[in-house]
């Protein structure tokens, strides 16, 4: 049996071409699509055996040089007496589709009606599991968010057991390969028309058995822990932002990496400033006399000097925004600062005395149309509707 002929590819075929051809043939001859068909079962085992060799660079090189009896073949050649064990053939099948069997709309869901998990794709077959990621929320003052700050967080979780270095055993001799699943962490069972892969009940999917557990972690390889973590919050962060600290989550198991720590930011509101992106908005109320005559005004800022001198031009209208450049929030990516936007609010006087009212009446008697251009423009527009209105 020539493995290249079995898969229908040339001897110069790329790994992608070999995998593509195997997938097509494996699906075609899969026992769940051909129940009771002995010939299809035989072909399924053959293409699985061929793929198991040609998908491995070392085995393929040895096969190309020496044939089926190469040094990487093991006793009886690459396939021995052929891949007669359906469990091995199905395991090869699972490996070929391993990256695509999770989530809705996956290959297997379309082909076998959502049985991806039934074919055993439930994580690393060797039992190595990355540690869980953790998340914490931190609240900053407006000023801390503006200048950046270093914070100390207390994080609860799991750390690698120092006694056994994460192995879970008191010594190397205290670990053995699981006899039931042969280290794969899964067992395959035939149920009616389906070949179902499930977590090995003996080892719980670990692929190994601990015969002499570590006394500190009781065979878990991890222990509960509370630790202080220092996190540098960059200047310019805003509510809803998230910082990722790789490797600061729970310790992994069986040599897998630790999870990550996600720090979610909340920024308190400020009594004076409102933030819009990297810009700050300051509401500045002024009297109508200052609005008419203009003025110079000290306005607060978030920078070290604490205040900035602002010129309010005469005749300014309520709602006008005056910009002070580079006095806003720092950009979180280091691209400068925003601006301080001062929104002027002209306040109409209230609770006037009779003397003040009389002065205003005298002022009104001196008003001219050019003193109120918007009013004049409005009256000009409606003059045709109300002929009795005059400027």
From Swiss-Prot:
Its cofactor is Zn(2+). Its main location: cytoplasm. It comes from the Bacteria. Gene3D superfamilies: DnaJ domain, Heat shock protein DnaJ, cysteine-rich domain, Urease metallochaperone UreE, N-terminal domain. GO terms for cellular component: cytoplasm. Zn(2+) 2 binds at residues 178, 181, 200, 203. CXXCXGXG motif repeats lie at residues 161-168, 178-185, 200-207, 214-221. A zinc finger (CR-type) spans 148-226. The keyword GTP-binding does not apply. GO terms for biological process: chaperone cofactor-dependent protein refolding; DNA replication; protein refolding; response to heat. Binds 2 Zn(2+) ions per monomer. Participates actively in the response to hyperosmotic and heat shock by preventing the aggregation of stress-denatured proteins and by disaggregating proteins, also in an autonomous, DnaK-independent fashion. Unfolded proteins bind initially to DnaJ; upon interaction with the DnaJ-bound protein, DnaK hydrolyzes its bound ATP, resulting in the formation of a stable complex. GrpE releases ADP from DnaK; ATP binding to DnaK triggers the release of the substrate protein, thus completing the reaction cycle. The J domain is necessary and sufficient to stimulate DnaK ATPase activity. Zinc center 1 plays an important role in the autonomous, DnaK-independent chaperone activity of DnaJ. Zinc center 2 is essential for interaction with DnaK and for DnaJ activity. Homodimer. Belongs to the DnaJ family. This is Chaperone protein DnaJ.
